[in-house]
Amino acid sequence: MAREPREGGRGGRDREREGDDLVDKLVTINRVAKVVKGGRRFAFAALVVVGDQKGRVGYGAGKAREVPEAIRKATDRAKRAMIRVPMKEGRTLHHDVAGHFGAGKVVLRSADAGTGIIAGGPMRAVFESLGINDVVAKSLGTRNPHNMVKATFAALERCASPRTVANRRGKKVSDILGRRDVAGTGEAAADV
């Protein structure tokens, strides 16, 4: 009698299922050297961004003697460190947000439909994996890809939908968005 393979097991909650259609983007690959008694020992470091293009994204770094092994390690780490980002209309951010990591600072702005992804290389990979189609992003400070990606994730973690903000404050979504009736005039308040 043949056994059916079980799902789950040790650490099973961290593993991705087959139907998760993840997109992975290689942000950078770098040759690094470890100096040992007999000379230098070379290895490769990879930075990978993984996302489902529906609001989940993660990044990971991996290092190994061979390039494919470094990419595999980075991809596995990225899959384990995924975050969910709320998106407006499934195409952009709900609000403008800034984030920083080390000397890297990024500013992310929501954009109108048809704007596209206006962002530098490492940030572009994050947005494409995330599934954001319209965003304007600017990187200030460092141009180091690792710090840019980490600063972008710091900014994305600060994003919140109006519903989340309303629940946190104990208010209605209409109060957060400023769509109240002003003294019975029938006009929506713009500056609340």
UniProtKB/Swiss-Prot annotation:
Keywords, ordered alphabetically: Ribonucleoprotein, Ribosomal protein, RNA-binding, rRNA-binding
Residue ranges occupied by any S5 DRBM domain in the UniProt entry: 22-85
GO biological process: translation
Keyword rRNA-binding annotated: yes
Cross-referenced PROSITE patterns: RIBOSOMAL_S5 (PS00585), S5_DSRBD (PS50881)
Pfam families with a match to the protein in the record: Ribosomal_S5, Ribosomal_S5_C
InterPro entries given in the database record: Ribosomal_Su5_D2-typ_SF, Ribosomal_uS5, Ribosomal_uS5_bac-type, Ribosomal_uS5_C, Ribosomal_uS5_N, Ribosomal_uS5_N_CS, Ribsml_uS5_D2-typ_fold_subgr
Similarity comment: family membership: Belongs to the universal ribosomal protein uS5 family.
Described function: With S4 and S12 plays an important role in translational accuracy.
Protein name: Small ribosomal subunit protein uS5
